[in-house]
């Protein structure tokens, strides 16, 4: 089984940051990406388990994978239009 988190186009380490900083950093990073590129987000704020999926829905990005059973949490999103 392949790890979906390998070889993202960009990686964002948001460890040590607390809400709302991780989502603000994700938004800033995604703005600089091209449609279809992937972003690996690494975070340890429990609020990201709600905020990152919600951000993807609201901003119409695709959440390809998430790993939230252990810290640090990992999320992989693909930038939408």
From Swiss-Prot:
Q: Which UniProt keywords apply?
A: Cytoplasm, tRNA processing
Q: Name one GO cellular component term.
A: cytoplasm
* GO BP of this protein: tRNA wobble position uridine thiolation
Q: Which GO terms describe its molecular function?
A: sulfur carrier activity
Active-site residues? 19 (cysteine persulfide intermediate)
What is the protein's quaternary organization? Interacts with IscS.
Homology family: Belongs to the sulfur carrier protein TusA family.
Q: What is this protein called?
A: Sulfur carrier protein TusA
Please report the organism this UniProt entry assigns to the protein: Pectobacterium atrosepticum (strain SCRI 1043 / ATCC BAA-672) (Erwinia carotovora subsp. atroseptica)
Gene that produces this protein: tusA
């Amino acid at each position: 089984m392949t790890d979906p988190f390998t070889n993202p186009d960009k990686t964002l380490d948001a460890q040590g940051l607390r809400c709302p900083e991780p989502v603000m950093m994700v938004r800033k990073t995604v703005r600089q990406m091209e449609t279809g590129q992937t972003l690996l987000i690494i975070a340890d704020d429990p609020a990201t388990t709600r905020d990152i999926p919600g951000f993807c829905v609201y901003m119409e990005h695709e959440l390809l994978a998430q790993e939230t059973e252990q810290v640090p949490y990992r999320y992989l999103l693909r930038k939408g239009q």
